[in-house]
A protein has these predicted regions:
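Active-site glycine-centered loops adjacent to acidic/histidine catalytic or metal-binding residues
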Residues: 49, 76, 167
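Catalytic-core segments of class I nucleotidyltransferases/pyrophosphorylases
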Residues: 44, 60, 64, 92-168
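Ligand/cofactor pocket segment of small-molecule handling proteins
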Residues: 78, 82-94, 99
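Short coil/turn connectors at secondary-structure junctions
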Residues: 12-15, 39-42, 66-70, 82, ...
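Short, conserved catalytic or adaptor-binding loops enriched in Gly and charged residues
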Residues: 7-13, 88-90, 146-147
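Conserved beta-strand termini and adjacent loop/short-helix elements that scaffold enzyme active sites
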Residues: 19-21, 73, 156-158
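Conserved N-terminal catalytic core of the sugar/cofactor nucleotidyltransferase
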Residues: 1-47, 51, 56-58
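Conserved donor-nucleotide/metal-binding helix-loop-beta segment in metal-dependent transferases, i.e.
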Residues: 52-83
Length: 168
């Protein structure tokens, strides 16, 4: 239905390229499929089940003008065990200590929302991932590995309205 509606994008003043993920192997797998298309450019992954009231202009400017290898958006939630979570490093303000997928005992209530600002460095990380217990290549694990290998990951917080429509 998406391709049917948007087509090649010309009716909307844009050019759309479709890249298909033939099996549900996780977000990191889907990102990896785009490697040749992206080349050496910084890029944004915006999961279709996320709705954000604020536009991405300020976040995009922050990321494109930085030397960060990734930037994630965080939002406080009441039920953090249902989301990928970021634990901030209290000893180093502005730094992330750990990123994890749907922990049973979350160390924070900061959900990693489904909008990721990335550089091509993520592809080498994804190439070395193993499938999770769910059989997926997890974006949270890729981001955590990117960070643990000494790459710079920034974050910003979403204070306005945000909804993950894929999470009841």
């Amino acid at each position: 239905k998406v391709k049917e509606y948007y087509g090649d994008g010309s009716n909307f003043g844009v050019k759309i390229t479709y890249i298909y993920q033939d099996q549900p192997k996780g977000i990191s797998h889907a990102i990896r499929l785009c490697k040749d298309f992206i080349g050496n450019d910084k890029f944004i992954v915006y999961l279709g089940d996320n709705v954000l009231r604020k536009d991405l202009t300020d976040y995009t400017k922050k990321f494109t003008s930085s030397d960060s290898d990734a930037m994630i958006l965080l939002c406080e939630v009441d039920d953090p065990q249902r989301f990928g979570i970021a634990q901030l490093d209290l000893d180093n303000p502005g730094k992330i200590k750990k990123i994890m997928e749907k922990p049973k005992d979350p160390p924070s209530n900061l959900a990693v929302i489904g909008i990721y600002f990335l550089t091509p460095k993520i592809f080498d990380i994804i190439d070395n991932l193993k499938p999770s217990w769910r059989g997926e290549y997890e974006i949270t694990e890729a981001l955590d590995n990117l960070m643990n290998q000494g790459n710079k990951i920034e974050y910003d917080t979403v204070t306005g309205w945000w909804k993950d429509t894929g999470t009841p």
